[in-house]
Amino acid sequence: METSSISTVEDKPPQHQVFINFRGADLRRRFVSHLVTALKLNNINVFIDDYEDRGQPLDVLLKRIEESKIVLAIFSGNYTESVWCVRELEKIKDCTDEGTLVAIPIFYKLEPSTVRDLKGKFGDRFRSMAKGDERKKKWKEAFNLIPNIMGIIIDKKSVESEKVNEIVKAVKTALTGIPPEGSHNAVVGALGNSNAGTSSGDKKHETFGNEQRLKDLEEKLDRDKYKGTRIIGVVGMPGIGKTTLLKELYKTWQGKFSRHALIDQIRVKSKHLELDRLPQMLLGELSKLNNPHVDNLKDPYSQLHERKVLVVLDDVSKREQIDALREILDWIKEGKEGSRVVIATSDMSLTNGLVDDTYMVQNLNHRDSLQLFHYHAFIDDQANPQKKDFMKLSEGFVHYARGHPLALKVLGGELNKKSMDHWNSKMKKLAQSPSPNIVSVFQVSYDELTTAQKDAFLDIACFRSQDKDYVESLLASSDLGSAEAMSAVKSLTDKFLINTCDGRVEMHDLLYKFSREVDLKASNQDGSRQRRLWLHQHIIKGGIINVLQNKMKAANVRGIFLDLSEVEDETSLDRDHFINMGNLRYLKFYNSHCPQECKTNNKINIPDKLKLPLKEVRCLHWLKFPLETLPNDFNPINLVDLKLPYSETEQLWEGDKDTPCLRWVDLNHSSKLCSLSGLSKAEKLQRLNLEGCTTLKAFPHDMKKMKMLAFLNLKGCTSLESLPEMNLISLKTLTLSGCSTFKEFPLISDNIETLYLDGTAISQLPMNMEKLQRLVVLNMKDCKMLEEIPGRVGELKALQELILSDCLNLKIFPEIDISFLNILLLDGTAIEVMPQLPSVQYLCLSRNAKISCLPVGISQLSQLKWLDLKYCTSLTSVPEFPPNLQCLDAHGCSSLKTVSKPLARIMPTEQNHSTFIFTNCENLEQAAKEEITSYAQRKCQLLSYARKRYNGGLVSESLFSTCFPGCEVPSWFCHETVGSELEVKLLPHWHDKKLAGIALCAVISCLDPQDQVSRLSVTCTFKVKDEDKSWVPYTCPVGSWTRHGGGKDKIELDHVFIGYTSCPHTIKCHEEGNSDECNPTEASLKFTVTGGTSENGKYKVFKCGLSLVYAKDKDKNSALETKYDMLIGKSFQETSEGVDGRVKKTKGKYVMPVEKNFQETTEGVDGRVKKKKKTRMDNGRPKKKQRSGRDDNQTRMQVELQEGNINSVIMHTVKNF
């Protein structure tokens, strides 16, 4: 009997728990026998075919599969030889589809993909066994499904005894989750806490995305890792899926404990029961007593103390509930080791000081969200063929829910069995207001907030995505101080109604919509609730701004947020409009469509004698404020943020006013502003933006009191001539860019980190410049009066970026040592000698007409990664470049003739991506071009190992590229043709696992010499076909040129573009295929030139080439290696390079040359490449080159002779004969 099934040593049990499907010839006497023993020792019934009479039909075994609860499908090398094994697998698949069986696949020295896709010898045996069998299709479906279930892999490195224990553990976990007899909701998650698991694909239990959640939670509960008692908190926003997760956990884990209890809906139960009922309920579950009394619990407590228990408490909402259960929890914690307690809550503060660790339940990813939504939207019609028609709409609803499980469930349920018109209508309604069923979920948490917390929550919704410090400052006031404001933010964060990310306060979209709904409801009630108005139709009535409507009182208006981009017509504002708004805190007239707020027309007509008695206002934003000053009755006592961009304001207010809370002021582009006297008492001011205030001439001396000012922007203040002497100790960023009349810079702070002096009229830096020991960025671009950089700049030890671009009179850069300087921009200067700075990474010398050569010592700049030499028109030669250089841009170096040989040092561990650009170097000599191509070849060879380093070969961008004037494909390319399309017949096994990448070449020509472009990009569409498969074309980058900084340029000459890429999709696809099969393959390549995003018709590819790049296999003899296009040697430092294609002798060995085509060369006995024959012409065009198998073998034998491999030569001779 070919089948392989196993059972217990006892008499046949009434029902077998486990059936093992395996190939007896492979595993019966080894692995499976040990597995059976281990299962029996754990009291698990196992079926074995020894109990059936030999010769009985297979139907008996299939019946045993139906009777079992779990099947272990063990796939081994010869599994597919047995039709019995495969028929059993077909039955297993049917039972798992019905939900009556749990399958755990085990891959014994096989990859799951090999089983799933029937690859290699495993697949060959299947095809041989199933040849002509009509059941072949169903068997393939079984192979496709079962291996997709997460299973256990046993490879060559595995310790089999450990894997046996892992399987036993998985079986026990699965058995605890299987419901009683007769239930059809079989659990399909089997592997529990191990590294493996199962899933059925038909998730009837609605746990989409829960597998990973459960696994993560189980890791925190791990009984093997944590021996003592452990309490875990499960937290997350309302409706995120905590209850579903805990029920799954309880169902899976309860069988591991002698006592276990799940108390759910604690929030609801606490509202209807006394708190002392909670410990009674818990003890009742744990002690199995019907009605235990807390006063007489000594015996239950002692039982609790002696047993390992599992306690799950769901939806805890108040500290009092925890306190009521504290005594029991303490007994559990002091009791027997191994107990576990899980507490789920939407308020993380309740778990502080109680739990050992916390698991935060995150939103679902897009895939699981879509599955969950579809499950509920088509719950009665999962096979609905029209589901595809609803896909686009589904994406919209899933995006709306943002991974929130309950929202997905609610929305899907509301759309179930509804028409597409209803779906469209529902989406439009959701844009106006959220679903009431979603609102009700958040309403429970909102109702439990204090009044202050409710106001803070609704206020934060108006300022979401703002800095946390900013939000807390707005909330802080005379009635709610900074401590209370921070407390409110923390409380809301703990309750998951808001969250902080990267220092910003964020809010889930559903909660944001909920907050808006709460405010809208307030207007429909008695008007006693404070309101925030943001809909323009609620603010503007009949062309007049008027919020006094219905029963709502002006005194209850807390905020007005008017987006002027939504206002079509001009509106008027009554002079007395704000008189009764004594509680108005936030007033914003802004434009959401123009971030810079510069193109908005002033749509609000304001009377001259506007009254603005807003004592409580915290935030005042008024785009294009039309008055010369704020009204006299305006009181900024609580003002925190003042923003009046593009205003007509000349000064803020008349006289001095107390501004103890003012921290942010933005008056940018208020071109009439001439006085800052109103800020004389703003001692807490942190940011001041005066960009574009072109009339402002001076700063008041009183501003020296601003000890907290950290940011000062004076960009474009063209009338500003100087700053007063002051010491702003907190100032970190100072911007004077474009202050064209600013001549002398005084040191107003020793703590400046970023200093912008670009476009000013300064001629020298201050004498005490060395005090700026925290200065990181110094920008002096376009300082045309600047003639020298003082040597004391070298004392700025923190300086990382120095920008001196377009300082036309700067001729000398001092010899200084700035150990941390990374970026040095000297483009457009008159410097004649390049500075030697060992730490510099980015060096720009472009547009320099003085430099004729670079110092030889540049090769020692080991940190240099980017060298910009564009338009250095006097540069005639370049020395050897350093090994880590990633980008060299020598575009437009019209005098450049020679390059160093070698062009750059290449390290044996080379892995840097790099680009070398020599476009429009019209005088580049032929020797220089040959060195560039030789360097490209060596670089391609070394980078072949990069695909193993970079994400398993999934690097899609070009790993190396270069371009230079020329009209020929380099000789080391194995395949080339005239035109933009290349078709190649590749050798068998070309795609074996040593394939590292492809080298591509394109020669382009400009059809219109007068055409100017800002970017050229050459790409190649690579397509491979063989007997079995056809792959979707994959586009590989070859190389590109970009004119940075704007502008366009001509590319008049023909240019050669060379690129090396790992071509990951093609290689990956072939590696997953069967590389052992000997199939001829055809490849087609098409090269295109694009100017940005679209094809550029003014440029064409008139020659192209291809070489496949392979890594050398030291375990194979070189006769086999000659099948490769380009070989990668063991050490490239051992070879002597050349471009003539000859075999160079290095240390007693010969290195295989890279040749254009074997048939083009004739070889002598000494291995040297003889003179090439002329290329044969067809119809006036070069004939496309093909490899000759005969010449290929000749070359192989000659190389073997060189290396003394006589046996290999004899083998090839016999084979050819």
Swiss-Prot record:
The active site is at E88. GO terms for cellular component: nucleus. GO terms for biological process: defense response; signal transduction. The keyword Membrane does not apply. Keywords: Hydrolase, Leucine-rich repeat, NAD, Nucleus, Plant defense, Repeat. It is found in: Nucleus. It is an enzyme of class 3 (hydrolase). Residues 14-175 form the TIR domain. Residues 211-472 form the NB-ARC domain. Induction: Up-regulated by AvrRps4 in an EDS1-dependent manner. GO terms for molecular function: ADP binding; NAD+ nucleosidase activity, cyclic ADP-ribose generating. LRR repeats lie at residues 260-285, 436-459, 614-636, 682-706, 708-728, 729-749, 750-774, 796-818, 819-842, 861-887. Residues 1162-1195 are annotated as: Disordered. Changing N195D: Loss of resistance. Loss of resistance. Gene3D superfamilies: Helical domain of apoptotic protease-activating factors (1.10.8.430), P-loop containing nucleotide triphosphate hydrolases (3.40.50.300), Ribonuclease Inhibitor (3.80.10.10), Toll/interleukin-1 receptor homology (TIR) domain (3.40.50.10140). Disease resistance (R) protein that specifically recognizes the AvrRps4 type III effector avirulence protein from Pseudomonas syringae. Resistance proteins guard the plant against pathogens that contain an appropriate avirulence protein via an indirect interaction with this avirulence protein. That triggers a defense system including the hypersensitive response, which restricts the pathogen growth. The combined presence of both regular and alternative RPS4 transcripts with truncated open reading frames (ORFs) is necessary for function. Interacts with EDS1. Only two amino-acid changes (N195D and Y950H) are linked to a change from a resistant strain (cv. Columbia or cv. Landsberg erecta) to a susceptible one (cv. RLD). This is Disease resistance protein RPS4. The gene is RPS4.
